[in-house]
Amino acid sequence: KYYLNFIKSIKNIDEKLLLQITNLISEKIKKKSQIFVAGNGGSSSVANHFLCDFNKGVMLSSRYKLKPKIISLSNSIEMITAISNDISYDEIFTLQLKNYVRKGDCIICFSCSGKSKNILNLIKYANQNKIDVILFQGFGSKAKNIKTKFYINLKHENYGITEDIFSSTMHVMSQYIRAQYTAKNQIL
């Protein structure tokens, strides 16, 4: 049943929207913009995996023509615990972003519920500073008062399926970009 639910949910993703997101990411990489990724729990693993597949995979597949600048805000346990302890867990992503973000950068958030205060604060900060936001959400409705350039809601309440789809869409995007630079699209 898990697998069938996974297949059903992944088929509900709007392919045109996913392609638009992938093209935005590709453009940001070509312009040498930074792309920040963030998530909590299992979604933080997706954010960190995103960093790996793009920074290494895309760079090598493009034979160094593309050099992605992916920064995971979920990656440094030292920063996360210092900010949590000294300021607030709700600021673990925003405070890091303030240190690095530049005009033209982009943020990608992975959130099962879409209600995590640290993710919402990050998106609000990005909105205030005109930074493009892409939000992948598992279930529930989009929080009020936040704006995203692109938004995908999987509408599935199983955390495992949601996080598997987050991971799968990340692979689809990275491999699509990689295939553009690989002979005969060998990756796909």
Predicted regions and their residues:
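Glycine-rich, small/polar surface segments that engage phosphate groups of diverse ligands
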Residues: 27-100
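A short, well-structured juxtamembrane/interface segment
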Residues: 13-31
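Glycine-centered short loops/turns at secondary-structure junctions
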Residues: 32, 104, 130-131
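Short glycine/serine/threonine-rich phosphate/pyrophosphate-binding segments
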Residues: 43-48, 115-122
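A charged, well-structured terminal subsegment
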Residues: 99-100, 161-188
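Short, glycine/polar-rich helix-capping loops at beta-to-alpha or helix-loop-helix junctions
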Residues: 135-148
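Short beta->alpha connector loops at strand-helix junctions that form conserved
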Residues: 111, 137, 152-160
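Generic N-terminal amphipathic, Lys/Arg-enriched alpha-helix
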Residues: 1-13
